[in-house]
């Protein structure tokens, strides 16, 4: 079964992201707008409890932090993806690092670029037609993130939340 | 903002439900297959913490329980909805009752019929064409439910999980 770890921003930021995803992201209906903290990884059912425990520890070890979105950018030419760029923050980096440290596999393929995807699998023409205009857009939003989520993937490609983990120590 | 409380069954039951929802449920892409415990209700942001606290208490007060699905049925003529009928269970009824007891509003409109929707807003012809065949289907599935979820609705009608609540006392 495929699992992943993500954070869902607030409704206003999700609504804003969806206004783009609707047109540019074929995953629009598969999962709400999110910041991926750990790409899909395979897990046997018997491994789940120890992974849940580890994600809970990681979440407890990182305090709630400000998430700041400040522009539209692309991974082109690596991929034809459009995203809201997220300001680097030590807490966000720490979450990502911990989720890619033993017992989890490292991500050898990419280094962490905090982002919220608003378009993907675009043709070169779609990307270049829109990129200039979108890069000019004034995007400025800041909010506090206080939770992350572990999700699993259904056969139709959509994602269901398995568990929420609050950041920082329990009240 | 609209909130709701639901339980998501296991992946196998969700995949089975989606094989029907794909054809019969226009909400297919808005939310994964679920059992509604509390229909959408409006909440101001400042009311959220006390509601979260109350849902957490309710979840703690009910132990994990078996969820049994045993046939396809319909709410016709009240509504043209198709669903997997869920065997009544005191724990499930208790969750529903608590979520409709002060500070929450009672549901004056319907009494609780535990179900997992697989089709809705069907025309009379669609419903009657398929109902006989679906009612004959051998549906038999049982699993343990150990968590419920509080969700909120985005502007596009889709739902994001806000928080997971484990049933019973914390380990």
Curated annotation (Swiss-Prot), chains A, B:
One of its GO terms (molecular function) is hydrolase activity, acting on ester bonds. A motif (HXTX 2) lies at residues 115-118. The active site is at 34 (proton donor), 115 (proton acceptor). Its EC number is 3.1.-.-. The keyword Hydrolase applies. SUPFAM superfamilies: LigT-like. Pfam families: 2_5_RNA_ligase2. Disulfide bonds: none annotated. The keyword Magnesium does not apply. This is Putative phosphoesterase BH1439. InterPro entries: 2H_phosphoesterase_YjcG-like, Cyclic_Pdiesterase, YjcG. A motif (HXTX 1) lies at residues 34-37.
